[in-house]
């Protein structure tokens, strides 16, 4: 978590609005205290916070495609509206640029919130955050992991990010993907993270075991390369290593933007 308390004070001092992107942790962070975990203030209790975004389709367990944004005042909310008073079809007013939205998504969201309820979200927080802490502890204490992997920052909620001290972290990501664990690659610095979900709470020990196996395998590959006098240059790279390795080495990120645009163009081809 970012230090929202400090950012709030800064926003007040500079007389600027402060938006809190709480899309990922919105149904976990408010439950941390009731679940018995360490927490930090992040919401409208901080005077500098003017708006908060919250994804109901993530840890809110609602259908994909809906999200919410909260404003401190109704006056601030009006800036998201789109109003066209001189349209030929009459006055057009919409809550946002997106225009028409399916009512089924709202109904599905409401049903999810009512079914799970506050107690259900607190229980999910206990399981999810508790599992994240188990994964952190395993990485920091495992004989095969503690000397090779390093936890990034201080995970307070569900996301555990880590990097490798001697190995290529993206090779580890590709090897984990081959075992069915699709972890998210990060850059600046190179790292990967796992966002713990309810299904992972039931198999987290298997994830750690597979991670131990992968690290041992990558360490052995590196040892063989060194014995044979081969460096990392010229070795076969997996998808993550190739993509993030190249992206991280390019001083001009406009090339990366062009590559991403080309990828998106392909998605539109019939």
Where are these regions (language model features)?
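Short loop/turn segments at secondary-structure transitions that flank enzyme active sites
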Residues: 26, 75-77, 200
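Non-catalytic terminal extensions of PLP-dependent enzymes
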Residues: 122, 131, 141, 146, ...
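Residue-level "edge-of-site" marker
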Residues: 24, 156, 189
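Active-site C-terminal subdomain of aminotransferase-like
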Residues: 1, 19, 31-158, 162-167
């Amino acid at each position: 978590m970012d230090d929202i308390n400090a950012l709030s004070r800064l926003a007040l001092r500079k007389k600027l609005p402060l938006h809190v992107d709480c899309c990922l942790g919105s149904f976990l962070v408010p439950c941390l205290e009731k679940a018995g975990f360490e927490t930090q203030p992040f919401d409208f209790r901080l005077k500098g916070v003017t708006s908060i975004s919250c994804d109901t389709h993530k840890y809110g367990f609602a259908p994909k495609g809906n999200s919410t944004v909260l404003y401190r005042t109704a006056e601030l909310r009006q800036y998201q509206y789109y109003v066209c008073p001189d349209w030929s079809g009459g006055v057009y007013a919409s809550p946002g640029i997106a225009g028409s939205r399916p009512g089924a998504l709202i109904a599905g969201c409401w049903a999810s919130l009512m079914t799970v309820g506050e107690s259900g979200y607190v229980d999910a927080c206990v399981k999810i955050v508790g599992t994240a802490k188990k994964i952190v502890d395993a990485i920091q204490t495992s004989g095969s992991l503690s000397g090779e992997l390093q936890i990034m920052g201080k995970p307070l909620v569900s996301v555990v990010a880590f990097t490798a001290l001697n190995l290529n972290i993206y090779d580890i990501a590709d090897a984990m993907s081959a075992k069915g664990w699709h972890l998210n690659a990060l850059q600046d610095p190179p790292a990967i993270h796992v966002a713990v979900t309810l299904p992972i709470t039931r198999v987290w020990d298997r994830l750690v075991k597979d991670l131990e196996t992968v690290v041992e395998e990558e360490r052995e590959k590196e040892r063989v390369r060194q014995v044979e006098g081969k460096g990392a240059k010229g070795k076969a790279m997996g998808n993550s290593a190739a993509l993030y390795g190249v992206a991280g080495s390019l001083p001009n990120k406009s090339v990366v933007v062009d590559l991403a645009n080309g990828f998106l163009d392909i998605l539109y081809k019939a």
